[in-house]
A protein has these predicted regions:
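Proline- and acidic/polar-enriched loop/turn elements at helix boundaries
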Residues: 5-8, 61, 128, 153, ...
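GST-like fold's C-terminal all-alpha helical module
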Residues: 68, 72-166, 170
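GST-like domain detector, emphasizing the conserved glutathione-binding G-site
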Residues: 1-100, 106, 113
Length: 173
């Protein structure tokens, strides 16, 4: 694979060349040169790569995997993203926004912790694309000012995933 970095701090994602492969001007995007296709949106990319590699997406368990993957795409990511906007990037500009998204963020941590009480990973005991999609949001726990210590199961999950060689390599890209 080849990595092309898009500098979102310089608005490179809004350039016409990039918008042709990502109409919403969002990262990530992949191009599969073997099949001559490009894909945008994390969930679509993860499903595509998992099906292509036959890893992290057990077809017999895809219903539960999809449920947690889409939960991340529709709820966890957007809500933690809003928390980042109000709490990390623009503190002091909206007390309502900061308080609202802090509470939602805390609730997400609690909900994930409860789920992980009953299973090693989000979709039972297999590491899947649902975990891959959710992990980067929890990896920003220092931005959330909640702390992982009071969430025993979420902490275990986070520590397990953060010690994986491929995850370490991915964060170093």
């Amino acid at each position: 694979y080849k990595i092309t970095k898009i500098n979102i701090n310089k608005d490179e994602q809004f350039e016409d060349k990039f918008k042709k492969i990502s109409p919403f001007s969002k990262i990530p995007v992949i191009i599969d040169h073997e099949k001559n296709i490009s894909l945008f949106e994390s969930g679509a990319i993860l499903i595509y790569l998992a099906e292509k590699s036959e890893k992290f997406y057990n077809l017999n368990k895809r219903t539960i995997i999809n449920q947690w993957l889409i939960g991340q795409m529709a709820y966890i990511g957007p809500m933690l993203g809003q928390h980042h906007q109000f709490h990390h990037y623009n503190p002091g500009k909206s007390k309502f926004g900061e308080e609202r998204y802090f509470k939602i963020c805390e609730r997400i941590y609690l909900e994930l912790d409860m789920r992980l009480k009953d299973s090693k990973y989000l979709a039972y005991d297999e590491y899947t694309i649902a975990d891959i999609a959710t992990f980067p949001w929890i990896a920003r726990h220092d931005w959330h000012d909640i702390g992982l210590k009071k969430f025993k199961n979420l902490s275990r999950w986070y520590n397990d995933i953060s010690s994986r060689v491929c995850v370490i390599k991915g964060f170093d890209l």
